């Protein structure tokens, strides 16, 4: 049975009171009655609070931006990208401004597609580089996240987008990243352990791989970045020829 927001709040309140009621028994009728009375009278939570927001303004679609030569036509080779779906206006503006070599700061609401504001322009710039003949390995963009869970979420998303575009490599360098396949098993074993049906060739999964051929897109966290900057064996990632 589906409940409204108010009904859900009332259900949670009722269940929580039942939990508290069943968790404490005083063995004294007077104290038990007093406890029951206070439990029924007390306000155990605030709310629910409802927040209304207007829909975000719509912009042009990726296909329209491709037709205007703002976005590279190789975007049509990517997976899990809706080329004809209209972008939000702030997403379109981000793509256009970065394509025009301008800096941006994105401040917009939850669920408004902030990731696309930086991910699409970065992929677009790398595609343009490769079209102009720059196909050397090296880090083109670094993504810093406070938690490994967020890194993993983005890697899962990139795996869908770039699986059919092997020219752009990517990888995550965190505490969970194995040093080599001896530590993490084979690529097939890594895929199996992480519930991945097929691991794309352009996803680098070991530290050795990334030191040998730095990925175009590197995902890490603040703490690991500090270690990478001071460890001699990781310095190869940041050599000028790899940036």
Regions found by a protein language model. Name each.
Residues 180-218:
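Conserved motor-coupling elements within RecA-like helicase/translocase cores
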Residues 96-104, 116-136, 157-159:
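Walker A/P-loop NTP-binding motif
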Residues 100-106, 137-141, 214-216:
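Pre-Walker A (Motif I) flank of P-loop NTPase domains
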Residues 87, 197-203, 227-234:
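Short gly/ser/thr-rich secondary-structure transition/capping motifs
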Residues 108-112:
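The conserved Walker
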